[in-house]
Amino acid sequence: MRYLINLCYNGSKFYGYQVQKDKLTVEGEIEKCLSTIFNRNINTIASSRTDRYVHANNQYCYFDIDIKVDINGLKRSINSMINDYIYIKDISESDIDTRRDVINKEYIYKINMGEYNPIEVEYVNQYNKIISEDVLKEFISRISGEHNFRSFTSDKDNNNYVRNIMISYYIDGDILYLVFNSKGFLRYMIRNIVGLLLDINDGKKSISDIDMIFESKNRCSLLRCASGCGLYLNKIEFKR
C-alpha cells in the first residue's frame, strides 16, 4: 500500500527538507516518527526538497508499506510526537508518485517593502525599500516563459536547465508577494531570480542585463541570492 502525506512546516528551524547526517531536517523528522510507529525503517519520497529556511504550506511525500494503515490514527500519532514546527495536514491512500506525477508547483516569495519588522525576519525578506511597479512588471515579462535558467542555479550536474515558468504578483500593505508557477524549478532558481530583481531595483543591475544573463549560462553573472526565509512552497498539483 502507498500512503500520501500532506504536510506544512516552518522551515526556519531546519537545515532544509532532505535528510542530512547530524542535522535537523523535515524529512529526517518524518521518517523518524514513521519508523518508530511501524517499528521498521520507513523511507519517504517528497515532491520538493526545499532548502534551509524555506517554508511549506503544502508539501507532499509518500511511503510504501505492506500493511493496511488506520490513516486517521496515524495522523494523530505522528502529530503527537513530531517536531512542533511540522504538522501533518492529511494522509490518504494513493498511487501518486510525488515526483513523477507533478504537473505544477507554486511557490510564493514575500518581500517587506516597508519598515523593518524583527518579528517577521524569519518569514518575510526584510528588503525595506519600495520596488517600482514599472520595474516589477518589465522584469516579470522578461523572466516569465520558457528559458534556459542555467545562470540562475548552482546545480552543475543537471541535464536540462530549460524551464517554463509563470510569475505574477500582488501587494498587500507593505508586503510584495511574488508568485511562481512551473512544473519544476532548479536549485536556488527562485531565490536567484528574486535577487536579480532586488539588484535591478537597487541600480546594481539593469533590465537590459537580463538577456545577457540568460545567454551567459553562468551563475557568476548574478550578484545576489535572496534569503530563503521569504520563500514558501505553496501548492503542488498532480496528474490524476
Located regions from the model:
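Structured-RNA-binding interfaces characteristic of tRNA pseudouridine synthases
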Residues: M1-R240
